[in-house]
Regions:
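Short, Asp-centered acidic motifs that coordinate Mg2+ and/or phosphate
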Residues: 35, 69-70, 151
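Rossmann-like dinucleotide-binding domain that binds NAD(P)(H)
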Residues: 161-230, 234-238, 249-250, 319
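A contiguous active-site-proximal alpha/beta segment in oxidoreductase catalytic domains
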Residues: 78, 101-164
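N-terminal Rossmann-like dinucleotide-binding module
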Residues: 1-50
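Beta-loop-alpha module in the N-terminal Rossmann-like domain of NAD(P)-dependent dehydrogenases
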Residues: 50-113
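Glycine-centered short loops/turns at secondary-structure junctions
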Residues: 91, 118, 217, 338-339
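Hydrophobic residues in well-ordered beta-strands that form the structural core
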Residues: 57, 96, 121-123, 246
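C-terminal glycine/acidic-rich active-site capping loop/insertion
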Residues: 241-319, 340-344, 356-385
Length: 385
């Protein structure tokens, strides 16, 4: 695209996510919100803050607009894969939030469609832009074996309390933690096990406990709860000589390193949070991480916009989320088996067989019946009149 190209973006949704992304896009250079499919309340706010923005009654109208290059789906959408497919077929780039689990096969199909249409399909990963998690990922990807964790523990709670329906579901929380864990370690586990607990027998799950076992022996334990009154997003990564503690909700000192080596008194925490650029952080042995104040929504939007303008379609994370979805499907199977470990490879092979099997197209003619292979799924039955 031309260097002075401005990306015209449409916003779909009426919740806080859409409002937040509309404001974030206003802070990104070479990006302009030109249309939105939203409620009257948010429409009034957008028209007040973004002069000239067009308002559509539904997502279909937004997708059909010729003055929209990309669409952001930041709020829960009914049948998200179908809506994304419509947008890609209309040659729109897509940034979407996975508010409820999407299957591995659906994500694979969408990724393939995006490649064929030469459009960028990206799913939001706001927490991956958190400066503390960026530091942690950088530290774990270093050459020093000192920072290779043998055990990881994550605790997540949105702080909605009482398991009400105003916040994310247990499924959404676990899927998000699976994604962060995959980003930190750079791979999917070999096997998983999971259990859920309910306050009442017929109630939705109030908490979940998931264990991940990796091929090299590393173990990760993920815990999620929707019954706690206080928000919590904490990580603990244990190495042979140090434990890294990360609290995403701690603004002052999100990262602490508890060292057990001779240089530090046993068990004493090193609180680290000077806001310095990554390039100025001299080595892994120091305790000064590259933390800086940031707006994760703005960073997410900037990454999306710059990838499109640079025609860098390889920045799509659809394949990554397909791997996360595969791990989630294994967790679901383990829950159905009351916590028994489930192999990721076994789930993957079943997924491939299910996708590869073609159903039969049954053509009924009078009293006769014949079958031929169908090219589309699901199977069709035709009855001539």
């Amino acid at each position: 695209m031309a260097e002075n190209k401005t990306l015209k973006i449409g916003i779909a949704g009426s919740g806080n996510g859409s409002q937040g992304y509309a404001r974030a896009l206003g802070q990104v250079e070479r990006a302009r919100v030109t249309a939105a499919a939203t409620s009257n309340r948010l429409a009034v706010d957008l028209q007040r803050t973004i002069p000239g923005v067009a308002i559509e009654r539904d997502v279909g109208g937004l997708i059909r607009r010729t003055n929209v290059d990309a669409i952001v789906f930041a709020d829960p959408v009914v049948d998200l894969p179908a809506v994304i497919r419509r947008a890609l077929l209309a040659d729109k780039h897509v940034l979407a939030t996975i508010s409820s689990p999407v299957t591995c096969s659906q994500l694979d199909e969408l990724a393939s469609l995006a490649r064929r249409r030469q459009r960028l399909l990206m799913f939001t990963e706001e927490r991956s832009f958190h400066p503390a998690l960026i530091f942690l990922k950088w530290m774990l990807s270093g050459r020093s074996g000192l920072w290779q964790p043998r055990y990881i523990r994550a605790v997540s709670a949105p702080g909605t309390g009482n398991g009400n329906n105003s916040g994310p579901s247990i499924a959404a929380l676990i899927v998000e933690e699976l994604a962060i864990c995959a980003r930190l370690l750079g791979e999917n586990p070999a096997s998983v096990s999971g259990v859920v607990c309910r306050v009442e027998a017929e109630a939705m799950p109030a908490a979940a406990f998931v264990n991940l076992l990796y091929a090299d022996g590393r173990v990760a334990s993920l815990q999620a709860s929707i019954t706690e009154a206080q928000e919590s997003r904490q990580w603990a990564l244990a190495t042979p000589s140090k434990t890294v503690l990360l609290d995403e909700c701690d603004i002052r000192s999100p990262v602490k390193i508890v060292s057990l080596d001779s240089e530090t008194a046993a068990g004493s925490p090193l609180r680290i949070n000077p806001p310095v650029p990554l390039a100025e952080w001299p080595s892994e042995s120091t305790v000064t991480p590259p933390l800086r104040s940031t707006d994760t929504k703005v960073d997410q939007c900037r990454h999306f916009v710059e990838s499109i303008l640079n025609r860098d379609l390889c920045e799509s994370n659809a394949a990554f989320w397909a791997d996360v979805a595969l791990a989630w499907e294994a967790v679901q199977e383990s829950v159905r088996l009351e916590g028994m470990p489930v192999s990721i490879n076994a789930v993957s092979e079943r997924e491939k067989r299910a996708v590869g099997e073609r159903p039969k197209l049954r053509l009924i003619r009078g009293k006769g019946m014949g079958t031929v292979d169908a090219r589309k799924r699901p199977a069709l039955t035709l009855v001539p009149r």
